[in-house]
């Protein structure tokens, strides 16, 4: 019943999304849409907010995503390309022929013979304006048998019925929990971390919440694990560190 980002314009009133049998949704910053459970097309039971993209879970366990895809958070196994443009330097900022270009964490500048350049995301694959099925591991098939979803910042995570978890998107702070810090445009399986050093992947996950720079998961036994940025002790493991790239117990 409510529309997030399916065109290039802001939407000031609720609009239907072309999806059926949805049981959960996790939406981007600025959206708090409690959808009507009796709606003939959408059957949404809960929603929460994150940052720039939207996840939806249907009754068959498939995950759908749309919106901003600058970090691969839509999970389509497609990367956003960057284009180089030349900028003139002024005391007020960097400008090109079209005017001032504001800074962004995605942009980088180089100095070469008194010429400044910046790299900006191209429009190709940057915005996914229609609900798109999230691909499976290694880009094969699609995620399935999913019971929980959460979108946070520019990252996404899902829990499968068998207790395994998968994350994709921004990984600057290790919030995908795959032991790395590289962004991923397709799901990466969550490592076991300190839960069980004798197995590779996390098992028995029940609920999950992806924040802007870290994530938290609860198990069927009531244990809580977290991973990602920890400069402010947000992982709750009794320590502070730059980041943890796999789960640690709270």
How should these model regions be labeled?
Residues 1-250:
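Eukaryote-biased RCC1-like beta-propeller repeat architecture
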């Amino acid at each position: 019943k409510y529309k997030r980002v399916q065109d290039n314009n802001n939407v000031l009133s609720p609009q239907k999304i072309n999806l059926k049998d949805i049981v959960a949704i996790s939406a981007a910053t600025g959206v708090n849409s409690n959808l009507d459970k009796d709606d003939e097309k959408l059957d949404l039971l809960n929603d929460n907010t994150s940052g720039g993209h939207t996840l939806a879970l249907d009754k068959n366990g498939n995950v759908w995503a749309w919106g901003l895809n600058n970090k691969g958070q839509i999970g389509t196994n497609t990367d956003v390309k960057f284009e180089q443009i030349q900028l003139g330097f002024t005391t007020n900022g960097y400008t090109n022929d079209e005017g001032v270009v504001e800074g962004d964490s995605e942009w980088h500048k180089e100095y070469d013979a008194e010429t400044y350049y910046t790299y900006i995301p191209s429009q190709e694959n940057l915005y996914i304006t229609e609900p798109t099925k999230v691909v499976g591991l290694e880009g094969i098939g699609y995620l399935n048998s999913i019971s929980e979803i959460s979108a946070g910042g520019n990252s996404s995570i899902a829990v499968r019925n068998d207790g395994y978890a998968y994350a994709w998107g921004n990984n600057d702070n290790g919030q995908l929990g795959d032991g790395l810090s590289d962004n991923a445009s397709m799901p990466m399986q969550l490592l076991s971390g300190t839960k069980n050093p004798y197995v590779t992947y996390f098992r028995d996950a029940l609920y999950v919440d992806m924040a802007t720079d870290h994530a938290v998961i609860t198990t069927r036994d009531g244990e809580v694990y977290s991973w990602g940025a920890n400069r402010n002790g947000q992982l709750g493991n009794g320590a502070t560190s730059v980041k943890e790239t796999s789960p640690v117990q709270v």
